[in-house]
């Protein structure tokens, strides 16, 4: 699996968090759920980094699941702001679609851990060859 410093999902998460910060800071009409929106968007990348810093295994998977939940929470806060006309349709859909892509990327990373285990495949191949 890739080093966390070279992960497209981490780059995407950082980019979304930066854009949300700019959006919040530039709105003439006050955005609602500011604290939660900032915190959730920043937590996506932070949890990805922490998970990959821990190495493969259940702790990494848990951090990736937390990141996925934070992305979903960010979408909910953006939706509330869009519904109350505090952010534009363009901003909402652009950020929402990018967050959906992040959720899918995280789900894919979680599936990789269970589908491909090179150590297990090597053991099974060697065992079958010896029979």
Could you tell me what each predicted segment is?
Residues 1-131:
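Amphipathic alpha-helical assembly/interaction segments
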